[in-house]
Amino acid sequence: MEPSALRKAGSEQEEGFEGLPRRVTDLGMVSNLRRSNSSLFKSWRLQCPFGNNDKQESLSSWIPENIKKKECVYFVESSKLSDAGKVVCQCGYTHEQHLEEATKPHTFQGTQWDPKKHVQEMPTDAFGDIVFTGLSQKVKKYVRVSQDTPSSVIYHLMTQHWGLDVPNLLISVTGGAKNFNMKPRLKSIFRRGLVKVAQTTGAWIITGGSHTGVMKQVGEAVRDFSLSSSYKEGELITIGVATWGTVHRREGLIHPTGSFPAEYILDEDGQGNLTCLDSNHSHFILVDDGTHGQYGVEIPLRTRLEKFISEQTKERGGVAIKIPIVCVVLEGGPGTLHTIDNATTNGTPCVVVEGSGRVADVIAQVANLPVSDITISLIQQKLSVFFQEMFETFTESRIVEWTKKIQDIVRRRQLLTVFREGKDGQQDVDVAILQALLKASRSQDHFGHENWDHQLKLAVAWNRVDIARSEIFMDEWQWKPSDLHPTMTAALISNKPEFVKLFLENGVQLKEFVTWDTLLYLYENLDPSCLFHSKLQKVLVEDPERPACAPAAPRLQMHHVAQVLRELLGDFTQPLYPRPRHNDRLRLLLPVPHVKLNVQGVSLRSLYKRSSGHVTFTMDPIRDLLIWAIVQNRRELAGIIWAQSQDCIAAALACSKILKELSKEEEDTDSSEEMLALAEEYEHRAIGVFTECYRKDEERAQKLLTRVSEAWGKTTCLQLALEAKDMKFVSHGGIQAFLTKVWWGQLSVDNGLWRVTLCMLAFPLLLTGLISFREKRLQDVGTPAARARAFFTAPVVVFHLNILSYFAFLCLFAYVLMVDFQPVPSWCECAIYLWLFSLVCEEMRQLFYDPDECGLMKKAALYFSDFWNKLDVGAILLFVAGLTCRLIPATLYPGRVILSLDFILFCLRLMHIFTISKTLGPKIIIVKRMMKDVFFFLFLLAVWVVSFGVAKQAILIHNERRVDWLFRGAVYHSYLTIFGQIPGYIDGVNFNPEHCSPNGTDPYKPKCPESDATQQRPAFPEWLTVLLLCLYLLFTNILLLNLLIAMFNYTFQQVQEHTDQIWKFQRHDLIEEYHGRPAAPPPFILLSHLQLFIKRVVLKTPAKRHKQLKNKLEKNEEAALLSWEIYLKENYLQNRQFQQKQRPEQKIEDISNKVDAMVDLLDLDPLKRSGSMEQRLASLEEQVAQTAQALHWIVRTLRASGFSSEADVPTLASQKAAEEPDAEPGGRKKTEEPGDSYHVNARHLLYPNCPVTRFPVPNEKVPWETEFLIYDPPFYTAERKDAAAMDPMGDTLEPLSTIQYNVVDGLRDRRSFHGPYTVQAGLPLNPMGRTGLRGRGSLSCFGPNHTLYPMVTRWRRNEDGAICRKSIKKMLEVLVVKLPLSEHWALPGGSREPGEMLPRKLKRILRQEHWPSFENLLKCGMEVYKGYMDDPRNTDNAWIETVAVSVHFQDQNDVELNRLNSNLHACDSGASIRWQVVDRRIPLYANHKTLLQKAAAEFGAHY
């Protein structure tokens, strides 16, 4: 039976269940769980001081009215003195600390001090704010409360008046109250894990609140977090529940109207036996029972408060789930053991930290043992090890009690998690807490997915995909894809690629997941550190459509994203997201603070709830998600999404383009390198998929290159690759083959160039079959005109015709410049003008040719981005300038000079045609890059040239005022010196006054150097000029020139390594240019231009790109092509995965993982390792137990009948009375604990619905045959309303002497299903063994109390009437009832009135006129179980035995079934009746579920 349900089953008539948990509203839930209210209140105080005073006044009036304290009202002198030697009352306080009336003579004079009589409640006088003097100046909250204060009042105080958010998780930390030593590493792990889970989930941490032991450890963990965290991360909520009477210096906290704030001094040296409050806790609840110095007063109130909070429900996206709670245990003593036992009994999962000492280590040592192996001697041994100092104080009864409690704790394995440092993959406490919550969640009964959903969010928050895969995504719970959408969004934003992969494996379809609202939400939560976020902000601020009255922070729309993406992809693409028609949709503001998405997903749930009514999907959701991941440079996430993409080659190339553009603007070098590496990876992916396609079908693969992709801005794969400069992709053999085919047009690529040249020179040869065509119609039956058109429109022919034309133009141009340049232009010169005009028309055609409709400005920018176009425009403008000067007689010669210079530019233009050559093409690139090298080299060279030239000029020449000669001397001569032209006069040897002008008056001679006129010798220091010359030549000729050569060599090597790629890449531009160029060469091209002018300007025919380079396919053809591409993409991914597995590094990693798995398997405890073998042994043991019991019954019967003497009785093994003789109705699963075959529920220490505590009975002491000398159970018999139908009360045996056992006593049947039972001292003994309690308890009679449980079942059917199935098996429905104040559903059975056949509960839901017919159904029903029922109300002298009868209706139209349905009704208001699907996770009492499991097994149905 589930622990939380055990104590609820103990009502007088099985119907008294506890009430439903109350439901609280979600108080101001925000998406960020980490935002603390203390910080909110702090800012609120700063802004609203008057409101703060009102709040204090409200608190001062509310708390005294609703919260009380306790005061001793009568002084009874104690035999003990205080630490100061003063006389104290038995409450622990002195005379001075009592009220004045308490020390006066009173009516209680002479009586013994009783807290129930001598302690009274009064309005509390200690509450408000607290500040720890000398330490942190943060304001804390505190309140003094009575130990009897309702939990609802305290919870109201915390959530409403203290302003705490409703927690998403409750962490109760318990353990050693005194300081203890922990290993530094374990201490660090504990602190880090505790803070991580609290910060991530928005949890409340509840401790004892004192500055010692585990509470101090928690406080220091919170302190370290506060010191290292930012303001936005908020404050952890740490609540200390301490005993008021043990708080040192508590007098300073008392003030009738509250203290705002109270100053508290942390005085550890003077605290004595008391304790100080911990300064690192945020809130304190000080529990008062009117005593002083008594520890443990807060435990009951803390337990009730934690249970109350955990029973509250919190709205999560329209679904109410309970607040999960977990107990974390460090070290500890008897109190800690009691706390763990209570926690597990109430269904609270516990995490025990092994290595922390004492109780925690004792439990950790035995946690993996079967309960039957946890014996008194074993616990005694463990206590002697871990409690060495106080072991001698342990009495036998105390050891027995500890053994019983530890057995109960270990028995609830689903609620116990042991954290072992560095084992089982647990590297932090937060993982152990997550596992504990998951284990507890799996053991709970519930209908919906809300519990699983919450655990999944925790797993995502802590990034434990392994736990989610093994503990959450299992066959026992089927996830709907829509249920995973909020968590999927959380995983995406928090960059958890493994979780995204897991969700995709479990049915999430990206096409259904990505809606406009989801996509917008994702972009609103971009990582602020990524470059795309800043670019998006810039676009938002500069949005021209933003209204003038708009707020400071503009609203994000998807067209803003499209604008940034178009900047990255290029203007040749269309916007990916259109502008909305209406801009009034409510959106979040941006910039959005980067919130680490919290696990509760409230905003996500509300997002999906809001969009569920009008879901609008994007055109390509996978593309949208891929872009979102790529712009944030998330490698693994993008890879997972790309694997799901449809248009995968275009997607990979687009990703490469985006990443390369982002890397150019990224300032962080590491990020830029990562982007370039990722861009290269996606280029390789595109190559890999295209290779697979090309191998399969060349024609279809080439269609993929030119297919217009609507999803990527109506562009093609080839365009994306060219714009991204993906040279490796463009140089792929398949793409080059396609370009070659385009280059040759309709000609066959097998034609040699010599054939083409011959046909160009003598085109009649076309009719001879010298040229072959690709199409058979041209090759075989083509007309001469068609063959000529196909030949002369081929780009290769157009190219060579243009080359011939251009060479003719240059020759004619050179002839005119050198031979025939007349004042009046000759016909040759006029031909040049016409020729140039045709070139101008062609450049204008290229400029205005806009098939992609980019617009004139963008097309012009794209045109001038090409170097050769710039050179063309420069040459044309220079020609126009020269022509203008040439036509003016006065400037004829300058015109000729300009035209001569222009001839150089036209000759340089020849290099463009060399790009088609594999040899010369890369050399042009080398020249371009070397020119850049020279440009930067000149800066270094200019430093030496100018410095030497100026120094030389100043030393040699005095006051040279002629600018031309000054430039010659300072710069020109110094530059010529580099090439060996050394001035002769620099050393004075070749000085000749006749070669210079002494005064500088001769314009054709330089000025003479400084010289001695008398001796005709130079006067300047010759040694200095020679030394300068030597140094100058050393640095320029040797150092700088060799540096330039090295730079050229590096550039050459760089280009030479990629010669093939560069040539293949740049030949595309030439091919595309001549593919779209008119066939006729200049100047005949003017005819084609005239035709184009008529079509475009006169007829308004739009320009269209040739289908050979950009082809828009039909929908059906495109869908088939993309499906084919997807299929081959999967092949590529499989091959890639296989290749990765074949790598040595991967093989080593796989071997390492297998070894680790094997080690883990060997380290598992025997229970887990044996698996199914243990289940078989348990089943065998059950059968043996049943056989032994039958033998015992036979022996007893024969002996009672006198068939044998006492001496002849065979000696049998002692009957383990609770060996599960078909006793699964006792609330345990068949294989729960192999060897733990005693009744369990009947030995729980706390008896249901009363304060009675049983005597602890460990497993080994259950059989009556086992000696148990200290066994002294209490006697308890409860009062019942039906006194006439029950046995006499009291602990005296006289009234019980009239009861006759083992027979039918009047109307009451006192016979046991297990045969005659022993009667000792007038009381019957439970045949299953000791329970720890004597008397009748809350049952109606001594001995067996017979009950009946009818299981009314039918087949579950769908709308068509067919029987539903699950895992092949048919599904049953059972009739269940839920009465007022009960939490669980139950079978309509239980106890019966003496002489009656129908249970009382069944009569309450069945009309009286139908009772006889139902009795007949019971008589005809199938008896499923008959025997002892392990119930928490059982005692040594009274127990429950039950009969379970199955009443099954095979046909849905059964007359009796219809009659039963019509006669069902609820006599009690609030009672519910329904048909419940039979499943092992339904919320039904565990005893009843076991009975139901037997019935399902009988029918072979699903359970």
From Swiss-Prot:
It catalyses: Ca(2+)(in) = Ca(2+)(out); Na(+)(in) = Na(+)(out). Changing residue 981 to A/E/N: Increases the permeability of Ca(2+) over Na(+). Changing residue 1397 to I: Only slight effect on activity. Changing residue 1007 to A: Nearly abolishes channel activity. It is found in: Cell membrane; Perikaryon; Cell projection; Cytoplasmic vesicle. Changing residue 302 to A: No significant effect on channel activity. Abolishes channel activation in response to ADP-ribose/Ca(2+). Ca(2+) binds at residues 843, 846, 869, 1073. Residues 1-20, 1206-1237 are annotated as: Disordered. Residues 817-827, 889-896, 951-970, 986-1022 are extracellular. ADP-D-ribose 2 binds at residues 1381-1382, 1431, 1433, 1485, 1487. Phosphorylation of TRPM2 at Thr-740 by protein kinase C (PKC) counteracts the effect of cytosolic Ca(2+) and elevates the temperature threshold. Belongs to the transient receptor (TC 1.A.4) family. LTrpC subfamily. TRPM2 sub-subfamily. This is Transient receptor potential cation channel subfamily M member 2. It comes from Homo sapiens (Human). The lineage of its organism: Eukaryota, Metazoa, Chordata, Craniata, Vertebrata.
